[in-house]
Amino acid sequence: AAGNRVWLKPSERSSRTSGFLATLIQEYFHPSEFCVTTGGTEVAESFAALPFDHLFFTGSAGIGKKVMRAAAEHLTPITLELGGKSPAIVDSSAKLKDAAASIIYGKLVNGGQTCIAPDYAVVHASDCNTFVQELRNAAQEQFSNPEELTGAIDEHQLARWHQLVQDAVDRGAQAIPLITPSINTAPSFTPVALL
């Protein structure tokens, strides 16, 4: 209605999803309204260098800097969603069961790939053990079938996850399993753990 064209370049790490999106968009939209370009990092770098009216990017800070430099060449306004940390604050008056259920849902829905997915919780020390148990209960209740959860998108991300958990454990954290994969789960599935 506003005459704004959308040109989408999805992540090269999700090539099957990108291809599916491209097929759907081509079927339901005219290319003058919405189009999709797929490809690797070379395509992404070229894409960001085009003179858009506005550019949105979601990804890492390192790639975000490259996108911003490329967009600056044409003074293209840019919106960067570079992640960060989303805390969940659970004060001593909170209903721990409700808080745990909300946090587990927020973290695990869509494979945790939402910009507001909680990354950590700040909980009063006197409530910590009870809260951890409520998180376990909520995880097992909401996601009783581990096959419903999303695995790592590729081997690099799977290795990164294992490295982050091991680094935390090496520094004194305790890894508390919340959901354990079943035998039928894809090899890319990582146990859902609380650190």
Predicted regions and their residues:
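Rossmann-like NAD(P) dinucleotide-binding subdomain of oxidoreductase/dehydrogenase enzymes
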Residues: 1-98
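ALDH superfamily catalytic-core signature
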Residues: 29, 62-195
